[in-house]
Design a protein with these regions (language model features):
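Acidic low-complexity segments
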Residues: 2-13, 55-139
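Hydrophobic side chains in beta-strands
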Residues: 6, 36, 120, 150-152
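N-terminal alpha-helical targeting/anchoring segments
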Residues: 12-69
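Broad gene-expression machinery/nucleic-acid interaction feature
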Residues: 13, 29-33, 42, 132-136, ...
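Glycine-centered flexibility motif
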Residues: 19, 31, 118, 123, ...
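Internal alpha/beta scaffold segment
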Residues: 43-45, 51-83, 114, 141-170
Length: 170
């Protein structure tokens, strides 16, 4: 039996200080986990997906071959529970989020002239799971979180957080 688990994100992070952008970055990352089960024995592997299909396929096949060999050399897994159904699910949460290109322009005009400090995390996260019994599960969501502080002239702070899936500019 083979179980595949996928996790990934495509997200943006922007750090603000004194109502100016101090740091920004994009994350485009995905990982694949493999679990090989044979004769009550369990082996696991995982790697970061490169996006190059041929390279990623070769790495996956190499790991499966390694786990096949390793599974004959390890003791049985006393906690092994095998899936018994082939149920599948798919949930994709669409959002009217903040595009990466528009994020800074959406925030800076509203905080101009204010001592605004914070971080924006914005983007999509993915999770998937499949096995050779036919189970397939996929979850995808888009969200944002703007965690910020407003600093007064006397150095007092008001903390706030604006988070969700649909950005409301008003």
């Amino acid at each position: 039996n083979l179980i595949l688990s996928f996790s990934g994100e495509r997200s943006q992070f922007v750090r603000f200080n004194n109502a100016l952008v101090r740091q920004t970055g994009l994350v485009d990352d995905a990982d694949l986990g493999l679990k090989f089960i044979s004769n009550g024995r369990t082996c696991s592997a995982g790697y970061t997906v490169s996006g190059n299909f041929d390279l990623d396929l070769k790495r996956g096949l190499d790991e499966i071959n390694r786990m096949r060999q390793e599974s004959s050399e390890i003791p049985e897994d006393p906690f092994l529970v095998m899936p018994t159904t082939s149920d599948s699910s798919r949930k994709v949460i669409q959002a009217n989020g903040l595009s990466f290109e528009d994020s800074v322009d959406a925030i800076l005009p509203a905080v101009s002239g204010i001592d605004f400090v914070g971080i924006l995390a914005n983007g999509k996260m993915y999770r998937g799971n499949a096995n050779n019994l036919g189970q397939q599960h996929w979850f995808e969501t888009e969200s944002f979180c703007l965690d910020y502080s407003l600093v007064t002239l006397s150095n007092q702070m008001v903390k706030g957080c604006y988070a969700g899936s649909d950005w409301n500019q008003s």
